[in-house]
UniProtKB/Swiss-Prot annotation:
Catalytic residues identified in the record: D93, D276
Phosphoserine carried by residues: S129
Stored Pfam families: A1_Propeptide, Asp
UniProtKB keywords: Aspartyl protease, Digestion, Disulfide bond, Hydrolase, Phosphoprotein, Protease, Secreted, Signal, Zymogen
Gene giving rise to this polypeptide: PGA
Protein name per UniProt: Pepsin A
Length: 387
């Protein structure tokens, strides 16, 4: 009888999936547009997605998270920090590795408009003397590091290091729909040697598998989810195709080719790509993206966005990413984003340091089409068409 109970317990653990619901909200860009601030923002800040992966600040600082690159994010989840837990809305970001939230020590307008962590109201908080700096645009966010219990989908992640911001210059953050960032990349790109949240979960035996997975819903305000410690096959069709990482740090893989109408439009002879839930669009080298924008008839509007005629979506071709020998087509309905105002291209150019070659960022535009599994135990990414 005892053996049976033990077996049942092990089965229950193996099937336990910890799910964080993600809510779709207006992006920071949309909020800036509605408040008439986008033009001023773009004049003051160079929005270059590559700065997230090639920071110019010292490696010891938390400079791998320039905040301007989150301005198009729409998917957010809730976590709790402290005892009792204080609630925060965060971006679950596979393109960075640190956790940070605003603190009560920050009195700038951007902080006062968001949830702020109060260490004095947590019985489990431990302070440190370590500082952090988060670079973005023309200024930086500064703060300190501390330890506390982080609640994620019912998991109590104890003794978790995280950042508490003390200054947040820049009025644009006032309009951001999120409080902070929860990074899900590898520990070797974390600032100050901090252990990322998922690594801490695994090290403490809080999840049964050394992986997590992401489903992003295309249409609904709800339905999107991050799953810790397992895979839910109801979110995808067919089989998962596994892609080995070409580099461990970011979730970086090799793309064989990118084609349209059977012709190569970029990435001839293979290229590198990062699968990043913390990037909303699909980013690539400026020249390649310019060719794609021209091919789909996109032109720039007053808000700096590339727009196409909504009536042309049905006639636009698929753009096909071939990865590890498998084709992943993106239909126009995926790479053209329809909102109340217009139809915008889901592609974005970026400046990349020359030694890095051709790099692409497979953001939410791609992940909405393909359920993604981030397998730390085997250093690979699994992809399958969403159900």
């Amino acid at each position: 009888m005892k053996k049976l109970l033990l077996l049942l317990g092990l089965v229950a653990l193996s099937e336990c999936l910890y799910k964080v619901p993600l809510v779709k909200k207006k992006s920071l860009r949309q909020n800036l547009i509605e408040n008439g601030l986008l033009k001023d923002f773009l004049a003051k800040h160079n929005v270059n997605p590559a700065s997230k992966y090639f920071p110019t600040e010292a490696a010891t600082e938390l400079a791998d998270q320039p905040l301007v690159n989150y301005m198009d994010m729409e998917y957010f989840g809730t976590i709790g920090i402290g005892t009792p837990p204080q609630e925060f809305t965060v971006i679950f970001d596979t393109g960075s590795s640190n956790l940070w939230v605003p603190s009560v020590y920050c009195s700038s307008p951007a902080c006062s408009n968001h949830n702020r962590f109060n260490p004095q109201k947590s019985s489990t908080f431990q302070s440190t003397s370590q500082t952090l700096s988060i670079a973005y645009g023309t200024g930086s966010m500064t703060g300190v590091l501390g330890y506390d219990t982080v609640q994620v989908a019912g998991i109590a992640d104890t003794n978790q290091i995280f950042g508490l911001s003390q200054t947040e210059p820049g009025s644009f953050l006032y309009y951001s729909p999120f409080d902070g960032i929860l990074g899900l990349a590898y520990p070797n790109i974390a600032s100050s040697g901090a252990t990322p949240v998922f690594d801490n979960m695994w090290n403490q035996g809080l999840v049964s598998q050394d992986l997590f997975s992401v489903y992003l819903s295309s249409n609904d305000q709800s339905g999107s989810v991050v799953i810790f410690g397992g895979i839910d096959s109801s979110y995808y069709t067919g089989n998962l195709n596994w892609v080995p990482l070409s580099s461990e740090g970011y979730w970086q893989i090799t793309v064989d080719s990118i084609t349209m109408n059977g012709q190569a439009i970029a990435c001839s002879g293979s290229c590198q790509a990062i699968v990043d839930t913390g990037t909303s669009l699909l980013s690539g080298p400026n020249n390649a993206i310019a060719n794609i924008q021209k091919s789909i008839g996109a032109s720039q509007n007053a808000n700096g966005q590339m727009v196409v005629s909504c009536s042309s979506i049905q006639s636009l071709p698929d753009i096909v990413f071939t990865i590890n020998g498998i084709q992943y087509p993106l239909p126009a309905s995926a790479y053209i984003l329809q909102n109340q105002q217009d139809c915008t291209s889901g592609f974005q150019g970026m400046d990349i340091p020359t030694p890095s070659g051709e790099l692409w960022i497979l953001g939410d535009v791609f992940i909405r089409q393909y359920f993604a599994v981030f397998d730390r135990g085997n250093n690979r990414v699994g992809l399958a068409p969403v159900a």
